[in-house]
């Protein structure tokens, strides 16, 4: 299974794709406008040459986007981050809830709680326990916990663009073992949830492993990729650290 190195490699590759996308899109649009201007002025030769340049840039961009989409469709293996010891639900909760920057924790029941962490970003972490994972049961459990936490700690859903871009949600599920349902849940590509204004990252802890969904081939903006990378680093560092030592950002 791919691990932390592959995760960060795929994040970097997605950022490079975004940069290449922007660099190709700008000259393509500029060439198109020039071609239109030449055509309007009656200079058909220059218009044809400029249109050809535009077609080249557009063709390269389309090829890159198709390659990115193919990688996204082929990325079905989740990332496995090693942990120093096996974790159960209570020890996971203790590691997260004692982190620097925790603003509040709401205990919904013995298997679900929500906590808010303010640091580089504003994280809302749902801590859920599913001995045997079920996607429908997990969704119902998460929705119930979020509704209860929203009543106890109301927060505005909208805001300035920079405020929204600084928020992220982490759904951290603790399971006793990996079953087919959990493999499908964590194996689902992160693209759709990362594309939301307040991006969502699904994670799971099973024994001495932290599992994260694939991001290979992602086509999302830089802030969303940064939130994904920072969220993974936050949870992994909290679970790897000695509770008596300060957290070290990865």
Where are these regions (language model features)?
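Catalytic cores of nucleic-acid endonucleases
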Residues: 131-191
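Short, flexible beta-strand-to-coil junctions
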Residues: 118-123, 128-134, 174-178, 207-208
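N-terminal topogenic membrane-targeting module
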Residues: 2-4, 60-125
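Core hydrophobic alpha-helical transmembrane segments of single-pass membrane proteins
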Residues: 30-31, 52-56
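Juxtamembrane interface helix immediately N-terminal to a transmembrane segment
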Residues: 3-27
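N-terminal signal sequences
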Residues: 25-38
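Hydrophobic alpha-helical transmembrane segments
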Residues: 39-54
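Charged, structured surface patches that assemble and position nucleic-acid processing machinery
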Residues: 188-250
């Amino acid at each position: 299974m791919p691990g932390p190195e592959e995760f960060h490699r795929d994040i970097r590759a997605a950022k490079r794709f975004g940069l290449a996308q922007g660099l190709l899109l700008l000259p393509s649009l500029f060439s198109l406008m020039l071609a239109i201007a030449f055509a309007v002025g009656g200079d058909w030769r220059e218009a044809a040459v400029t249109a050809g340049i535009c077609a080249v840039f557009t063709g390269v961009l389309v090829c890159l986007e198709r390659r990115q989409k193919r990688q996204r469709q082929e990325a079905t293996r989740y990332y496995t981050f090693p942990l120093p010891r096996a974790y159960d639900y209570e020890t996971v909760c203790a590691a997260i809830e004692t982190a620097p920057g925790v603003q509040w924790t709401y205990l919904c029941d013995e298997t679900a709680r929500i906590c808010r962490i303010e640091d580089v970003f504003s994280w809302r972490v749902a801590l859920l326990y599913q001995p045997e994972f079920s996607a429908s049961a997990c969704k119902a459990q998460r929705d119930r916990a979020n509704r209860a936490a929203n009543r106890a700690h109301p927060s505005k859903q909208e805001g300035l663009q920079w405020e929204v871009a600084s928020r992220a949600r982490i759904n951290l599920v603790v399971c006793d073992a990996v079953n087919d349902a959990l493999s499908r849940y964590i194996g689902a590509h992160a693209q759709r949830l990362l594309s939301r204004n307040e991006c969502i990252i699904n994670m799971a802890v099973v024994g001495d492993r932290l599992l994260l969904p694939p991001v290979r081939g992602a086509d999302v903006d830089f802030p969303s990729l940064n939130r994904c990378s920072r969220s993974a680093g936050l949870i992994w560092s909290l679970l790897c650290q000695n509770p008596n030592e300060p957290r070290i950002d990865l």
